Amino acid sequence: MDKSESTSAGRNRRRRLRRGSRSAPSSSDANFRVLSQQLSRLNKTLSAGRPTINHPTFVGTERCKPGYTFTSITSKPPKIDRGSYYGKRLLLPDSVTEYDKKLVSRIQIRVNPLPKFDSTVWVTVRKVPASSDLSVPAISAMFPDGPSPVLVYQYAASGVQANNKLLYDLSAMRADIGDMRKYAVLVYAKDDALATDELVLHVDVEHQRIPTSGVLPV
């Protein structure tokens, strides 16, 4: 073999080695595959826990259904003694109740703790009789009644509790905007007294879209 053949053979061997090294799996490729598998399993777990019609559950951010919008009601509970109750009907603005036959699909409660919050509260939504004055004895009798879920929200030393929302699906009931006055948000200060500067409640009522005015208010 002459010198030129030896040099050519050496180059071919180096080229084959370089091609082989590029195709060999690296540790970063293996780590990426493991991470992808973990993310896939996490997505399956999260999707399995989404709320259904028959199982209200905690949610993060929900989009309104097509053709629907929402109206929010804000309530700041007064001082509630330990072991006592507070209730307020879901009274929507007149501009919304004017369209009382528009269907309501869902109700969502959002608990917004203020900086001084250091208590434990139980929050729920109940359908209440029109004659009810939402007194403490009346709420006490209604609170444990029925299958409606309850949000237990409590102070956490490491920060606010992550689960601060509860969603109710009313689609099967064919409830409408006019029915909302028959519902009330109820609060139970089970273990601690609740001060007036500890908590704000937001109730989001998802309903069919209503016409909006094109004229600015006077």
UniProtKB/Swiss-Prot annotation:
Residues bearing the modification N-acetylmethionine = 1
Coiled coil: which residue ranges?
none
Q: Which SUPFAM superfamilies does the record cross-reference, listed alphabetically? A: Positive stranded ssRNA viruses
- In this chain, composition skew of type Low complexity spans 1-10
Tell me the segments the record calls region Disordered.
1-30
Alphabetized GO MF terms: RNA binding; structural molecule activity
* GO cellular component term of the entry, any: ribonucleoprotein complex
Q: Does the keyword RNA-binding apply?
A: yes
Please provide the record's keywords in A-Z order: Acetylation, Capsid protein, Ribonucleoprotein, RNA-binding, T=3 icosahedral capsid protein, Viral nucleoprotein, Virion
Function, in words:
Capsid protein. Probably binds RNA and plays a role in packaging.
Family to which the UniProt record says this protein belongs: Belongs to the cucumovirus capsid protein family.
Q: What is this protein called?
A: Capsid protein
- Annotated source species: Cucumber mosaic virus (strain Kor) (CMV)
